[in-house]
């Protein structure tokens, strides 16, 4: 079949199971080949081929609503809804998004980049449906990794209480990104081994219906027998107690089982949970045999060998450098512990976990719990390193404020993927953390200019005992700078001048330092002497240096790879205002007030104007007339 010619899923209605099985194989081959060039979330999508096809055959999208959670398992859905020709642009600038995108297709009714949101969204859609009196099916498809998120459990509780008609598909592949952890995952394991429960339950109900109505005592006894047998067969029927009709577990790669259970679910009133067992990476051996999450999402790879295609890095990854330094310091201080919300591989904590298993805590997709747990450990004298992506730190905001900062707990928050992250797009860009952290009392916030300074900042953070401290660091690799042999402690709230200058000042930090230095070098050739300051402490700022700069009256340009609204530049404007320096020319460069979509970081920086050329232009515009040739008259 020509997969690129698919316009919508209606063609599936006429296909036999044998034809669907052939289609499954074709789709897997297409995904393996296509993603070998572009990269993407291959593991999750190879696992949901049959499930996605079965859903589109059995239901009528977009009238019936599919909510994919997490959204990276929606590639087959995209293919079946007419986007095959766009797969060569997957996750590229102006190309096909790697997550559901409402502006892409009417079949994408809910956008998910962060996990555990589908059930709440589905509850909202079901409530709206019932108010309007329409009849569509609402079908959230949630991976059991996403089910460990507290938000999903809150929604399960509410859905069961409201008894809304809904079919929840639990896509249980035993993994989220890394292997799942926690009691819920263990419970699902017990359910997998108790597949006879549904059959026994149905037989019991049939027999009980045939018992003559001889009084309440016998009926009550029968109910107790049924309940006792239920708990004997399946320890803790969690979903049924919440008010769901539980179906499964069923083989997620068997069309016979999928159709039988989907048809039963459609006829059942109230919320239904269909527990589907799938194999992550099915059909591609390197992905099938992955046990730690390497093949969850990848870059390009060689199909025949499974080797990843990537240039040899000239420097270590930022995640590896930070976690490696934490691990190094943990050898000397047994109070240091590491906490991650389901990202041990991405945060490069495998080495720490292997060396210090008793001090490593992967709490699952539970950012709020991770933050508050870190506070609890800190208040008992430990030194917790909370490794968390910038985009996921958003989910723990109240815990950072209420539990960490308000209690002045000595927690080191390692904010990974700070700044633009590229291909994962607007749900994952790490651009909001400065704005939502810099105003919180007690918190220190910093970002290094390179990996050498990064190691010193990790050392500073784990030796800081005055309260919480956070370090931002970007996705990708360092610059390959020379590393100091000895770790140092950087005085809190101090900046450094990287390049002297007497005509203007650039204040920046982190990934934009290199661009600022290059711009200053070019401006020097045009007769402008521009000072470049490494404003490595975003909070507290170096007030002594800042006051001196303001007293000089020099034009100031702030640059940050973060949102301008409430960001570092706003801090400088506020400080200048507080000192009464109303006439100092100050300009700001950063992320504009909109969500930044997917694409290479280079392309995105060009689009939003965070470039060397624009830095030079902004400096020239700040200068008074006649300071620079060609400006003024």
From Swiss-Prot:
Q: Which catalysed reactions does the entry list for this protein?
A: D-glyceraldehyde 3-phosphate + pyruvate + H(+) = 1-deoxy-D-xylulose 5-phosphate + CO2
Under the heading InterPro entries, the entry gives: Dxylulose-5-P_synthase, THDP-binding, Transketo_C/PFOR_II, Transketolase-like_Pyr-bd, Transketolase_BS, Transketolase_C, Transketolase_CS
Catalytic activity, EC:
2.2.1.7
What pathway, per the record? Metabolic intermediate biosynthesis; 1-deoxy-D-xylulose 5-phosphate biosynthesis; 1-deoxy-D-xylulose 5-phosphate from D-glyceraldehyde 3-phosphate and pyruvate: step 1/1
Q: Which key words tag this protein in UniProt?
A: Isoprene biosynthesis, Magnesium, Metal-binding, Thiamine biosynthesis, Thiamine pyrophosphate, Transferase
Q: Name one Pfam family in it.
A: Transketolase_C
Q: Which GO terms describe its cellular component?
A: cytosol
- UniProt xrefs under CDD domains: TPP_DXS, TPP_PYR_DXS_TK_like
What does the note under cofactor report?
A: Binds 1 Mg(2+) ion per subunit.
- Binding-site positions, thiamine diphosphate: 72, 113-115, 145-146, 173, 284, 367
Q: Which residues bind Mg(2+)?
A: 144, 173
Q: Which PROSITE patterns match?
A: TRANSKETOLASE_1 (PS00801), TRANSKETOLASE_2 (PS00802)
Q: GO: which molecular function terms?
A: 1-deoxy-D-xylulose-5-phosphate synthase activity; magnesium ion binding; thiamine pyrophosphate binding
Essential cofactor(s): Mg(2+); thiamine diphosphate
Indicate the segments annotated as coiled coil, or none if absent: none
A GO BP entry is: terpenoid biosynthetic process
Q: What class of enzyme is it?
A: transferase
* Organism superkingdom: Bacteria
**NCBIfam families recorded:** dxs, PRK05444.2-2
Q: What does this protein do?
A: Catalyzes the acyloin condensation reaction between C atoms 2 and 3 of pyruvate and glyceraldehyde 3-phosphate to yield 1-deoxy-D-xylulose-5-phosphate (DXP).
Quaternary structure? Homodimer.
Family the UniProt entry places it in: Belongs to the transketolase family. DXPS subfamily.
Protein name per Swiss-Prot or TrEMBL: 1-deoxy-D-xylulose-5-phosphate synthase
Organism of this sequence: Bacillus velezensis (strain DSM 23117 / BGSC 10A6 / LMG 26770 / FZB42) (Bacillus amyloliquefaciens subsp. plantarum)
């Amino acid at each position: 079949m020509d997969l690129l010619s698919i316009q919508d899923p209606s063609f599936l209605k006429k296909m036999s199971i044998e034809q669907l099985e052939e289609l499954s194989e074709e789709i897997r081959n297409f995904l393996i080949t296509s993603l070998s060039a572009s990269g993407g979330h291959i593991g999750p999508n190879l696992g949901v081929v049959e499930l996605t096809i079965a859903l589109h055959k059995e239901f009528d999208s977009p009238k019936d609503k599919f909510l994919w959670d997490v959204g990276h398992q929606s590639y087959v859905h995209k293919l079946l809804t007419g986007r095959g020709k766009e797969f060569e642009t997957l996750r590229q600038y102006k190309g096909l998004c790697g997550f559901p995108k409402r502006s892409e297709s009417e079949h994408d009714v809910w956008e998910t980049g962060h996990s555990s949101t589908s059930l709440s969204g589905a509850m909202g859609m079901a409530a709206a449906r019932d108010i309007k009196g329409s009849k569509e099916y609402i079908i959230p498809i949630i991976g059991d990794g996403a089910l460990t998120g507290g938000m999903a459990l809150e929604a399960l509780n509410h859905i069961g209480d409201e008894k809304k008609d809904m079919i929840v598909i639990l896509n249980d592949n035993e993994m989220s990104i890394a292997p799942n952890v926690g009691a819920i995952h263990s419970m699902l394991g017990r359910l997998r081994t108790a597949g006879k429960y549904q059959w026994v339950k149905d037989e019991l109900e049939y027999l009980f219906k045939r018992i003559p109505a001889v009084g309440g005592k016998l009926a009550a006894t029968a109910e107790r027998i049924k309940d006792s047998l239920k708990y004997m067969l399946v320890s803790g029927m969690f979903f049924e107690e919440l008010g769901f009709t539980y179906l499964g577990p069923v083989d997620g790669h068997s069309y016979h089982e999928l159709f039988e259970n989907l048809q039963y679910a459609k006829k059942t009133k109230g919320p239904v949970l269909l527990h589907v067992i799938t194999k992550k990476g099915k059909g591609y051996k390197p992905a099938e045999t992955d046990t730690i999450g390497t093949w969850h999402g990848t870059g390009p790879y060689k199909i025949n060998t499974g080797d990843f295609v990537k240039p040899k890095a000239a420097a270590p990854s930022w995640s590896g450098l930070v976690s490696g330094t934490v691990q190094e310091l943990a050898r000397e201080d047994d109070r240091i512990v590491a906490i991650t919300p389901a990202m041990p591989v991405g945060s490069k904590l495998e080495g720490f976990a292997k060396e210090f298993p008793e001090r490593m805590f992967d709490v699952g997709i539970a950012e709020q719990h991770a933050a508050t747990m870190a506070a609890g450990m800190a208040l008992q004298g430990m030194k917790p390193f909370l490794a968390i992506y910038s985009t996921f730190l958003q989910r723990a905001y109240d815990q950072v404020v209420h539990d960490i900062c308000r209690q002045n707990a000595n927690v080191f928050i390692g904010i990974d993927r700070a700044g633009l992250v590229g291909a994962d797009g607007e749900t994952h860009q790490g651009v909001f953390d400065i704005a939502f952290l810099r105003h919180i009392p007690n918190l220190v916030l910093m970002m290094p200019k390179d990996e050498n300074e990064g190691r010193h900042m990790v050392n500073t953070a784990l030796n800081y005992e005055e309260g919480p401290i956070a370090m931002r660091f970007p996705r990708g690799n360092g610059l390959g700078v020379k590393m100091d042999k000895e770790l140092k402690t950087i005085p809190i709230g101090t900046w450094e001048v990287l390049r002297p200058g007497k005509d203007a000042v650039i204040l920046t930090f982190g990934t934009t330092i290199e661009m600022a230095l290059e711009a200053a070098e070019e401006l020097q050739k045009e007769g402008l002497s521009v000072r470049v300051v490494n404003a490595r402490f975003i909070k507290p700022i170096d007030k002594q240096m800042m006051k001196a700069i303001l007293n000089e009256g020099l034009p100031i340009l702030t640059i940050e790879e973060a949102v301008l609204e409430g960001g570092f530049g706003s801090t400088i404007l506020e400080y200048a205002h507080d000192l009464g320096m109303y006439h100092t020319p100050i300009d700001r460069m950063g992320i504009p007030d909109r969500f930044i979509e997917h694409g290479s970081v280079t392309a995105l920086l060009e689009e939003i104007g965070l470039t060397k050329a624009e830095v030079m232009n902004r400096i020239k515009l700040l200068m008074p007339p006649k300071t620079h040739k060609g400006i003024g008259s």
